[in-house]
Structure formats: C-alpha cells, structure tokens
Amino acid sequence: MKISSIDSIFAAWDGSITEARRLQSDMAERIVLKDEPNLLSEPTLLAGFDVGFEDEGRTTRAAAVLMNAGDLRLLETHVVRVPTSMPYVPGLLSFRELPALLQALTQLSRIPALVFVDGHGIAHPRRLGIAAHFGLVTNLPCIGVAKKRLVGDFVEPGTAFGEHTPILLHGTQVGWALRSKMHCKPLIISPGHKVSLHSALTWTQRCLTGYRLPEPTRQADRLASRRGQKIVSDLPSLL
C-alpha cells in the first residue's frame, strides 16, 4: 500500500514537545467520529498494528498483519525496523511510533477497510492518541485498543465476558472499558478516526477469540514483541 511521504507528514513539526502538543490539539479537531460508509456493510479486510523496541530503544520495530474480516484468517504479516526518532514522552507516543507504523503499512499488499492499533484513539489528554494520529494521516478507519487507561473515568465493568462501561473525560464519552476475557483487566477501547464509539466497541467484540486482545492486535503484538527477530516473511494471500 502506498502512502504519502513520511517526511512530509511531519514537515509541520519543529521537533519540540510544545509544538507536538499544539499539533495534537489542532489535529484532534479534524478527527471524524462517524462510521466510514463501508463499515456499515461488510468490510473484507482488517489490519492490526503494534510497535516494540530493540537495542535499548534505539530501534523501533513495527508489526502489521492483514486479516480476512469474515473468519479472522491471517493473510499477511510484516515487520519493519527503523531508527527511533525521539525518546519516550508521555502523551506523545504517536510522534515516536508513527514513522515505523507507516513504514509497516506500506508493506501491505491491499488496503484494509478497518485498522486496529495497539494504543489509544481519542481516549487521550488531547484526544489524539496513536490510533487517532494514524487514522488521520492515512485516512483509514481506525480503532485504538489499549491495555491500560491513560485518561478518563469509568465504572469497573462486570466480571462476565463482554461486559463494558463508558469512559468519560470531562463529561464526554471517549471510549469503553471492555471485559474481553474473564479474570483479566478490561481493555480500553476508543475510536481513532472514521469510526463511531458504538462501532469501535462492536468491531472489537467481533474480533475476540478467547484471548484478552482482539485478533488483529493480538497477532501484531506477537510479532512486535519478539526480540531479535528477523523480518517476517509474508504468508501467501488466500483471497
């Protein structure tokens, strides 16, 4: 899949933390929280993305998977490595991880109808977590799936599988706490771009297969967390 120049995406950023936060606030105003029309039908392809680090953080490793939306069959896997461009700064994860994620996206042979990213969407201090930033610059419908809360308040969901409660930030709902597996902490689900709050929840639920993580980010997480792994060869496309 081709995308615009990664350098051009960051051209407006001068590298400072203050400017990055200002850009986040500006970009957050462009986020669309309505479903892309093709989500109302039956998307055929899903993608999942996650990031890990090697060499004591000097190398960013991004994993991408492409899946059949109907049966969650794995079609492609890719891992790319790029030099880490900035240190970890709370709330600015997307500026650190996005270059590698965009490189991983270019490896996909087809455009996914819906993307899951390991991280937050609008459940973020400035409503622009990694999933929202990724969705905005790629113009792809995107959902953030995070393992821990970053902002907001919620009532702990019930212990049964599928129980969920809204996450509120300053009185506005920004996501869901979802009990994706019994005896596990809830996931933090939030829309990134071109996905409604309702669809962010229902699509995540559709992709659960007995594990805590939905299948797209579970598979990407497995790839991104393998230390010292060489670039993963593609699985043959079965569509």
UniProtKB/Swiss-Prot annotation:
HAMAP family: Endonuclease_5. Its cofactor is Mg(2+). Its EC number is 3.1.21.7. One of its GO terms (biological process) is DNA repair. Mg(2+) binds at residues 50, 118. It is found in: Cytoplasm. Its main location: cytoplasm. Belongs to the endonuclease V family. The gene is nfi. Transmembrane segments: none annotated. The record marks 88 as: Interaction with target DNA. Keywords: Cytoplasm, DNA damage, DNA repair, Endonuclease, Hydrolase, Magnesium, Metal-binding, Nuclease. Pfam families: Endonuclease_5. It catalyses: Endonucleolytic cleavage at apurinic or apyrimidinic sites to products with a 5'-phosphate. This is Endonuclease V. It comes from Xylella fastidiosa (strain Temecula1 / ATCC 700964). DNA repair enzyme involved in the repair of deaminated bases. Selectively cleaves double-stranded DNA at the second phosphodiester bond 3' to a deoxyinosine leaving behind the intact lesion on the nicked DNA. GO terms for molecular function: deoxyribonuclease V activity; magnesium ion binding; RNA endonuclease activity, producing 5'-phosphomonoesters; single-stranded RNA binding. Signal peptide: none annotated. One of its GO terms (cellular component) is cytoplasm. InterPro entries: Endonuclease-V. It is an enzyme of class 3 (hydrolase).
